[in-house]
Amino acid sequence: MVLLAMGLVIYLATSKYGNIRLGEGKPEYSTLSWLFMFICAGLGSSTLYWGVAEWAYYYQTPGLNIAPRSQQALEFSVPYSFFHWGISAWATYTLASLIMAYHFHVRKNKGLSLSGIIAAITGVRPQGPWGKLVDLMFLIATVGALTISLVVTAATFTRGLSALTGLPDNFTVQAFVILLSGGIFCLSSWIGINNGLQRLSKMVGWGAFLLPLLVLIVGPTEFITNSIINAIGLTTQNFLQMSLFTDPLGDGSFTRNWTVFYWLWWISYTPGVAMFVTRVSRGRKIKEVIWGLILGSTVGCWFFFGVMESYAIHQFINGVINVPQVLETLGGETAVQQVLMSLPAGKLFLAAYLGVMIIFLASHMDAVAYTMAATSTRNLQEGDDPDRGLRLFWCVVITLIPLSILFTGASLETMKTTVVLTALPFLVILLVKVGGFIRWLKQDYADIPAHQVEHYLPQTPVEALEKTPVLPAGTVFKGDN
């Protein structure tokens, strides 16, 4: 499914359909702000954790039947991060986003919700039992996916805060961190996208760029650069094998625990990301959305992961920090803290990292709250936003539910299993949406010459009905008897 999504969006970007404009008028946001909001909507703050520590998991339990803890396992650890956070994942987001944006901005269908688009494609009533079930599944899956980001972020943040200030690393401090972040994104949600989320996303985007840039400058620059180039080469060379690796001669644990989990995690987020991308992409062309999401977001992820993981690997192979051992004995949060503290002016780097993390968490939860409020709003039209009170309600909900899960002490594996189970129905839903999208494109643009596509707006069924003349009663047509 992920490979099919990638193939389809690349075809759309390079064909005449790429020039279809999603709504009338000029884009509402600058390209940079637009890309930053993509990143905040599509990535959780736990990205900052995985961006430092994920390679160590792959080093200990690698894919492709590579020997654990070998030189080859170390060499493939960064490429696997690039693979899981790269083009395939963002292509899935892109496809779902294009379908929703076309439904809302081109076809002018009402309702920025999953049930709304399913209703437009299949004819089921969005307020009927099937429509309500679809929206309920979306809300449950979104909370489940968000929980992993929030719990991992809280644990990483409090471990780093403890190293900086001496505060205890316990549930009370973790709860305070979550509530603090909740307060920030509640305020941002109340202010609105233009003055709230847009500003937070800019702070996150610049912070997530400047932090690894400084690490690249003050760290082992040559090693990091060579590591990134090598990882890009290995990812490109082995992309198809990584995508289709099922481990038929082994137990399949790597594929199941990592690749399948990641694909389903991304898929569980697709409805929410699609709603948010639709909201901020009015006036953009289809190919702009495709290249912005696939290339812009992938390059951003690869730069952060490439620099931070390569620095951690350098510290490991030079005997400064045994990151895999720390990961096993003290946990990934401690491994992240020790890697950052090993930098020159390590405390400043750790403080900056934690600052970016808390703002990242707030901006991501703000975007999620917006999509959940949009799902709960009937007949939302182009240019409208969900009610502020409804947005605040969902802000509170997505703060308290993960907080309760954190209190129970659920393991990461348990949360990953929950994500997999709740995401499975969205595979079917995504296939239904893809079928409807292809049908719409054929109906609306198949006969339109390529040079006219950009300025052509198809007539919606509602517009066609409004333009149908209403004849007086008793009108007799020629040939009637």
UniProtKB/Swiss-Prot annotation:
Compartments reported by the entry: Cell inner membrane
Predominant place of localization: membrane
Membrane topology, from the record: Multi-pass membrane protein
A Pfam family hit: BCCT
Transmembrane regions listed in the UniProt entry: 32-52, 82-102, 137-157, 173-193, 204-224, 258-278, 289-309, 348-368, 392-412, 418-438
Disulfides per UniProt: none
One Gene Ontology molecular-function label: transmembrane transporter activity
Cellular component, GO, one term: plasma membrane
Endpoints of the signal sequence: none
InterPro entries: BCCT_CS, BCCT_transptr
Coiled coil: none
Keyword Cell membrane: yes
Assigned keywords, A-Z: Cell inner membrane, Cell membrane, Membrane, Transmembrane, Transmembrane helix, Transport
Phenotype on disruption: Deletion of yeaV has no effect on the aerobic growth with D-malate as the sole carbon source.
Family the UniProt entry places it in: Belongs to the BCCT transporter (TC 2.A.15) family.
Function per UniProt: Probable transporter whose substrate is unknown. Is not involved in aerobic D-malate transport.
Name of the protein described by the UniProt record: Uncharacterized transporter YeaV
Native source organism of the sequence: Escherichia coli (strain K12)
Lineage, top ranks: Bacteria, Pseudomonadati, Pseudomonadota, Gammaproteobacteria, Enterobacterales
Name of the coding gene: yeaV
